[in-house]
Amino acid sequence: MYQPISTEFPVYHRTSSFSSLMPCLTDTWGDLPLKVDDSEDMVIYGLLSDALTTGWTPFNLTSTEIKAEPREEIEPATSPVPSVAPPAETTTAQAVVPKGRHYRGVRQRPWGKFAAEIRDPAKNGARVWLGTYETAEEAALAYDKAAYRMRGSKALLNFPHRIGLNEPEPVRLTVKRRSPEPASSSISPASENSLPKRRRKAVAAKQAELEVQSRSNVMQVGCQMEQFPVGEQLLVS
């Protein structure tokens, strides 16, 4: 059966324990607004009084330190900025001189021309010079023709597709040799002074010998002319 709950609270009256409890509470929490004439305050007082009778006091509470949690600073979310790639440097700024194609049997001379050579198996692999050409392609073609004549279809060629085209032979570069200047028999006095002492003596002796020979030749011609009588004709057969 339903029993009505009594809403009447026990009435506590002020006793001597109130005066002993109040200093204990006020030392911990300060002045409490408990009024003797207020029924609700007396209810609170009664609860505190019962707690004191069981041996509880406010001083038994252990103060626990509350450790402040570290505050994490949250950075505002920012949209990633797209990285802009630096402009590509022009190839002309860093242009590297490309090396020419290397052909089989071709070597470049220090002065820029190209020489063609081939190893002759009949001469124990000795190098045979084929000539000097203006371009590397011409030198490579000259090597191909010589290699095909030596080894036939087994030859390793630079331009195998051109070997059967019957192209003319590449033009070789001819080196013009300077002809030696004829040594002059007469030497100027200035040049004689620049020659060493022994050299000057040899030159003087040579000149004297030439002069003696020329004089002897003149004398021989004069003697031969005197042998012919005056007025007679010389018949040449």
Curated annotation (Swiss-Prot):
Where found? Nucleus
InterPro entries for the chain: AP2/ERF_dom, AP2/ERF_dom_sf, DNA-bd_dom_sf, ERF_plant
Q: What induces it?
A: Induced by ethylene.
UniProt DNA-binding region: 102-160
According to its UniProt entry, the protein's GO biological process terms are: defense response; ethylene-activated signaling pathway
UniProt entry keywords in alphabetical sequence: Activator, DNA-binding, Ethylene signaling pathway, Nucleus, Plant defense, Transcription, Transcription regulation
**Keyword Transcription regulation set for record:** yes
Q: Where is this region: Disordered?
A: 175-202
Write out the biased-composition intervals (Low complexity): 181-194
Q: What is known of its domains?
A: The AP2/ERF domain binds specifically to the 5'-GCCGCC-3' motif. The affinity of this binding is higher if the seventh amino-acid of this domain is basic.
Return the protein name.
Ethylene-responsive transcription factor 2
Which gene underlies this protein?
ERF2
